[in-house]
Amino acid sequence: MPTNRMQIGLCFDRTFPPQLVTELARALDRGGAGQLWVIEDCFYTAGVSLAASALTVTEQLEVGIGILPAVARNPAVTAMEFATLDGLAPGRLLPGIGHGVQTWMAQMGARPASPLTSLEEVLVAVGRLLAGENVTTHGHYVDLDGVQLDQPPASPPPLLAGVRGPRSLAMAGRVAGGVVLAEPAGPAYVRWALEQAGRRPDDFHVATFGVLCVQRDREEAYRIMAPWLARVLDEATTAITAVPFYDDLAARYAEKGLDGLVSMPPQWWTELAPIGTMDDAFEHVDALERAGVRSVGLYPSPDVEVARGQVADIVALAAR
């Protein structure tokens, strides 16, 4: 079972075929890696069924769900799903709920007028249900009348909020048991996020996502991942704008393009993700642990064969 040390695992890419989840889960479990994170992006594979598949074929592995869109299910059903998963593998579930991509929510006719309010109401309701309470609430988005789970978890897992911005982080600090921070979640971003949440890492479960690329030749890893970093810079989310060298990085990319990213200082790459040599990867995850992170999910290559080979890298990082 998981220890007090930061746990490291693999993120199951949304494009992977669902039958691959049991193979990768078993490989991680045998190797001693701590976690597998399943991703629910619309309209790819579903998080709950992937999590159930992974939990039932493993003995020690924690499985995180990162994340379920808050308004895609009734919160009573979400709580039932989480309670059932915890019953299948007590103590090995890390459930996450987030805003969801709003354009996807609109496609389903489920886009809320206030993503922040809807997420807060869902987190509170699901948390109360998992705690075994009889819940009656009539909010803007959650309407429950005397709902109580028949089999709530004996020890409810921390309910994690998949959030990014200051207002959402502050809300998560009030009502959630932790956060899932999307990639590239480096140590500077983690410290900023904890500050926004108004929480300390000793009582708030911080999970981060990153991308993994370990090569013997550091520059080769940079060449492989430069297009990914370019996309991150184009999106300019708080995960990248929070890094202390963001202005210099953005200017470098604007002036020199991908070549400028490949040749940027190695320590910038190490801040952003486990990209470079294995020593660089160790340095990155150690910095995350010092920043207060408890769980790290790493995206492998979307190429299945390459991803299979990267399981060994994740096992090595987990055994550090």
Q: Model-found features: residue ranges?
A:
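N-terminal beta1-alpha1-beta2 module of alpha/beta enzyme domains
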Residues: M1-G66, P157, V304
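Active-site-adjacent beta->alpha loops and helix N-cap segments on the catalytic face
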Residues: Y44-S53, E183-R199, V304-G309
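Hydrophobic faces of well-ordered beta-strands that scaffold small-molecule active sites
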Residues: M6-F12, L36-V38, V63-G66, L93-I97, ...
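An alpha-helical appendage that flanks or caps ligand/catalytic pockets
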Residues: P2, P112-Q148, V190-R290
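Alpha-helix-loop-beta-strand connector modules within alpha/beta enzyme cores
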Residues: T45-L68, A72, E121-A125, L129, ...
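Active-site mouth loops of central-metabolism enzymes
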Residues: M6-Q19, L68-P75, P153-V163, L212-Q215, ...
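Short, acidic/polar
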Residues: F16-L28, E81, G162-R174, M225, ...
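Conserved, mostly hydrophobic/aromatic
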Residues: G32, A54, L85, V126, ...
